[in-house]
Structure formats: C-alpha cells, structure tokens
Amino acid sequence: MKDLFEHIYANKGSIGRWSDHAEGYYVFPKLEGELGPHMKFQGKEILNWSINDYLGLANHPEVRKVDAEAAAEYGAAYPMGARMMSGHTTMHEELEKRLAKFVHKEASYLLNFGYQGMVSIIDALVTKNDVIVYDVDAHACIIDGVRLHFGKRYTYQHNDMESFEKNLERAAKLAETTGGGILVISEGVFGMRGEQGKLKEIVALKKKYPFRLLVDDAHGFGTLGPRGEGTGVHQGVQDEIDVYFSTFAKSMAGIGAFVAGNAKVVDYLKYNLRSQMFAKSLPMIYVKGALKRLEMMETMPELQQKLWDNVNRLQNGLKERGFNIGNTNTCVTPVFLHGSIPEAMAMVNDLREHYGIFLSIVVYPVIPKGMILLRIIPTASHSKEDIDRTLEAFSAIREKLETGVYRAINAELTKEMGDM
C-alpha cells in the first residue's frame, strides 16, 4: 500500500509543475493599493488590466460609504447561521426581489458564493435519470457541478450549433429510455475568450427538443443589456432561460451570487441547494453593499456607457494595429499571439517591468501549444490615456516577440521546457 501523499509529493499537477518559475510573479502575484486601474506590484506603479471591476464600483465613493456604514452597524458576522436556520433577514429578501425584477424573472435566491453556488445548482436540478449537455469551454464551476451528476453528460464543441444539436439529439434519445429530462448549460459570456454564448440559437432548438436551459452570466450581468440585465436580455431571449445565474464578484465588485427563474423552481432550489442549506448566510455587509451596487446599476447608465466607450477604443485600436482578438463581442478582450511558454513569461515580465502594464497571461494547457493569450479587462475606470499607452506597448512587445528577443532572454528556460 502506498502513502496517500506519495503522488502529491511527486507531481504538483499541470499548473503546479511550473510553480518554481511562476509563483509570486506570474501566479499568486500580490497587487497592492486601492482597487482600480492604477495599483502597485512589487513596489512599482502599474496600469492594471486584470480585475473584473467592469463598472468601476469597487472604489466608488458611494459604494465605499455604504460598505463602511454596513460594517459599522452589523459587523462581519451578522446574521449567524444558514438561511434555513437563523441567518435569514428581510434585507436578504429585499435584495432577492430587486434582483429578480432587474433580470426579468419571477423570483431569485441569494447564494453566499458564486462557485459553490453553481456547483450546488447543477447538483440540485438533475437526477441520475437526467442528461446534461454543456459547452466544452464551460467554466470550472460548471464542470465541477457536472462531475457530481450520476447520470450521463455530453459536451458540445464551443459555440458550435451543429455539434450542440448532434449531442442534444443523443441526449433526447437517452432521456427517452431513462425517463429523465435534459439540462443544457451555457455561459452568457465566456470569460476567457469574450464570446457570447449563442443563446438565441440554443433556445430556438427548444421547439424541437424538450430541454431546460441554465445560463451562467457572470461576465454578462452588468455589462450587457440596456441597463446591464445580462446576455439573455441583450439577445432578446431572457424569457427562454429557465435558470439564470450570476455572481456579484465582477460588475458588482462584491461577494455573493444569485440564481433566478420561475417561482416554483427557485422555491425548490431554496430547499435543495446543499451549499446554502448547510453553510453560513451571506453576511449583511455584503447584502447591503449589493443593494447599493444594484441601485447604481439601475440609475447610473453612464457607468455602462463609459465601460463600452473604453471597450470600443481598446478593441478597435488593437484591430487597427493588426492584433488578433478572436471573436470577442463583449468587454473581455483576448489578444492571441504565437509563442512558447518561456517567451510568454519573458513578454509579461517586460510588460510589467519596463512598460508598467499588468495583465493576465494564459498558455498551454488552457489554450493550444504554441499560443499565448493576453487577456485585457477594460473597465469604466480606465482612461483614454491608459488605453493609448497600452496600445503602444503592445505594438512594441509584438515586435520583440517576432524578432526573437523574448526567446533569447529566456533561452535556458526554453531549453528546459521545449517549444511549449
């Protein structure tokens, strides 16, 4: 018999294997200062493109004031216990009513954390006789939720409607034999590449196949729709989304999440979401803070307008310079380049140390070998000067990449890793 930890000591995993080279700089970096476009990294001022504070609410004075007042009045603990037992308040109910109205649903239910909330939603919605069909590029919280499913699941190629219908047909045939139903899961906005899920095309197939649709709209809520009501409203299909989910961690710059749908489904989830039934209620400081943030989304359209002004300036500028930003049609701005992992590391180091620009880097195995993805997250708080400075820097680093400067800088690391 082996020691349980033997495999842990031998292999840190696909990402952990690079920790000796990456930790503290490329992964687990420490950003300091007030949240926003201008922060500090390792003691230096940086222009930050790596936080999802889309509407600039994280450091908005009205938000900070309400957060401070709520903390002073309630502390960090109130209410204590799970919602079902002793952690329920009228403020939780008020937020749920307002969220439901905002996203055009009958009812909503608060979740204390987005990731575990989504895992629990999937677990609660399906039985072993049901079949799940989901996009292959779904977020990890969806994948982990699907892993709990004892029944069959099918993945379809990303945003590929031919692949989707093929797998939907397989699911329908299987569900006929098991006596179960079908749950389709998509993201409203895919956070890595910035593409909207093809919700309009998906719901059109409801006429042919009897399925229910769950949408994770973490990046669409607050950014899409006339007031930020989300991707479903933006595409005109919100009524066809059976279960709508979003987090407070992005546009609302807070903690928590919610799920919305018809009243009967939400009531069922209220009594069957294990991650909520057996966990502490969302603290009042976050509930009061979310109410304020929602009010600002409802009454300050200029925040969303400023966001999109910045998105358009950035994305148009990148395209004019010949950069490949994929098929993004949202705020998420990916820049695809050809290069190895060592070249990517040298490039990001150059951006941070010599251009003062901080952003997220994505490499293999998340994307294909030989590709580098630099993900830029524009917000309402960025300025035109921030964008123009970044565009100039990107032109400079691309030239260095293409002329082999970064390969030469990390020659030893390249030798160790190979052409990854």
From Swiss-Prot:
SUPFAM superfamilies: PLP-dependent transferases. It catalyses: isopentadecanoyl-CoA + L-cysteate + H(+) = 3-oxocapnine + CO2 + CoA. Pyridoxal 5'-phosphate binds at G114, Y115, H219, T247, A249. Gene3D superfamilies: Aspartate Aminotransferase, domain 1, Type I PLP-dependent aspartate aminotransferase-like (Major domain). Pathway: Lipid metabolism. The modification N6-(pyridoxal phosphate)lysine is found at K250. Keywords: Acyltransferase, Lipid biosynthesis, Lipid metabolism, Pyridoxal phosphate, Transferase. It is an enzyme of class 2 (transferase). Its EC number is 2.3.1.-. GO terms for biological process: biosynthetic process. Pfam families: Aminotran_1_2 (PF00155). One of its GO terms (molecular function) is glycine C-acetyltransferase activity. Its cofactor is pyridoxal 5'-phosphate. Disulfide bonds: none annotated. Belongs to the class-II pyridoxal-phosphate-dependent aminotransferase family. Transferase involved in the biosynthesis of capnine, a sulfonolipid present in the outer membrane of gliding Bacteroidetes and essential for gliding motility. Catalyzes the formation of 3-dehydrocapnine from cysteate and isopentadecanoyl-CoA (13-methyl-myristoyl-CoA). In vitro, products are also detected when 13-methyl-myristic acid is substituted with tridecylic acid, myristic acid, pentadecanoic acid or palmitic acid. This is Cysteate-C-fatty acyltransferase. It comes from Capnocytophaga ochracea (strain ATCC 27872 / DSM 7271 / CCUG 9716 / JCM 12966 / NCTC 12371 / SS31 / VPI 2845) (Bacteroides ochraceus). The lineage of its organism: Bacteria, Pseudomonadati, Bacteroidota, Flavobacteriia, Flavobacteriales. The gene is capB.
